[in-house]
From Swiss-Prot:
Compartments, as annotated in UniProt: Secreted
GO cellular component: extracellular region
Species of the source: Conus striatus
UniProt name for this protein: Conotoxin
Tissues where the protein occurs: Expressed by the venom duct.
Gene Ontology MF term list: toxin activity
Sorted UniProt keywords: Disulfide bond, Secreted, Toxin
Keyword check for Disulfide bond: yes
Length: 31
């Protein structure tokens, strides 16, 4: 799923924790 990171959409983002809001962007091979 997509994740909002610093106002940008990170397709390969993921949630930090099931009970926490926010996300971590570790995008690899992003196009």
């Amino acid at each position: 799923g997509d994740c909002s990171c610093e106002g940008q959409i990170c397709k390969c983002g993921y949630r930090v924790s099931p009970g926490k809001s926010g996300c971590a962007c570790t995008c690899r091979n992003a196009k």
